[in-house]
Amino acid sequence: MSTPADPVVIVSFARTPMGGFQGALAGAKATELGATAVKAAIERAGVSGDLVEQIFMGCVLPAGLGQAPARQAAVGAGLPLSVEATTVNKMCGSGMQAAIMAHDALAAGSAEIIVAGGMESMTNAPYLLTKHRSGARIGHDQMMDSMYLDGLEDAYTPGKLMGAFAEDSAATYQFGREAMDAYAVAGLAKAQKAVTSGAFAAEITPVTITTRKGVETVSQDEQPLKADAAKIPTLRPAFSRDGGITAANSSSISDGAAALVMTRESVAKRLGLPIVARVVSHAAHAHEPGLFTTAPVPAMRKALAKAGWAVADVDLFEVNEAFAVVAMIAQQELGIDPDKLNVNGGACALGHPIGASGARILCTLISALQARGGKKGLASLCIGGGEATAMAVELV
């Protein structure tokens, strides 16, 4: 953890808009989205790229991107070739794990300034011919969707999607279709208000895309204003004929990136960098793969204990809505005030680019704390395979 004498701090943050599947950001690779977020975060910090020593970037679906995606993002952002780059894959927790690794490296004195974040273009995840290394020989073959295989399917029950496990947890906690839809409707309303009011302005950096029509600039989250709350109760269940989980009360397949510039407080003061927040604690939890939807609860409890905080001490919470039921479980088990949870909407409305979301919710949490006069925040994500990460931050 950060030492009281010289805590690890966040000096800037930036994220791209969240793009829909095959939507506004389809023309950009994950590494290009990552480069956009990194460049903006560096510029907002007012730090020379020559002082950045390392970069950690989450990316869950690297197939087809080429060597070292994090390195590509760093070079694309204009960072010096001397910057060491590491690509992080911890499923949906990848972006937050990048920040955790940056924190620990800074606390250990391994570096003075590190960029951490995540990036994903689920739109551009390729299909795979898994048997063609040795040749199909004869007859038909099968293509595998790398987005499903490496991102959305359970590794221990081949072919079973994450949503099927979410159905199981909804049944266990007795959250029916009506309750999950009500959560999704409320979240969509919050996200739509945030988009139209400019609440995300402190987070978002525009993305410039070259298309057949010319150069286009994407400057706001794509999906909230396209969604119709009235249609949510009419949608068919997505994972079980009689289930309650639908496309609306699940996160949507998305594209996007986010980045934070992190250092130690003493370094920030020496260089005159703006200190936005300090990292108070971080934690992780792992248990049965099929129970991944519940893993944020113990991870958050651990992070709270390390911070010396009670739930009531926290001003705002960001719990990634891989499915609405994930945040609903955390709210119920921890006794979170619903007015403090995902106040600008969550992934059900905004989208969930899996390698980026861990960094995205940190950006959103800090931005919301600033806008609402809060100070203490806690963010967490469930992770396929039965894990979760959590990070507590405090505005300075």
Regions found by a protein language model. Give the residues of each.
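Conserved catalytic cysteine-centered active-site region
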Residues: 59-113, 156-162, 226-252, 333-360, ...
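Flexible glycine-/small-residue-enriched beta->alpha junction loops
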Residues: 113-169
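Conserved active-site "lid/cap" helical segment
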Residues: 2-65, 69-77, 81-84, 165-177, ...
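N-terminal extracellular/periplasmic Venus flytrap/periplasmic-binding protein-like
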Residues: 9, 15-16, 26-35, 44, ...
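Beta-strand segments within the central parallel beta-sheet cores of soluble alpha/beta enzyme folds
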Residues: 50-58, 85-89, 114-118, 179-186, ...
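Active-site-proximal alpha-helical scaffold in enzymes
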Residues: 88-120, 170-199, 259-266, 331, ...
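Active-site pocket-lining segment
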Residues: 165-167, 200-203, 209-211, 280-349
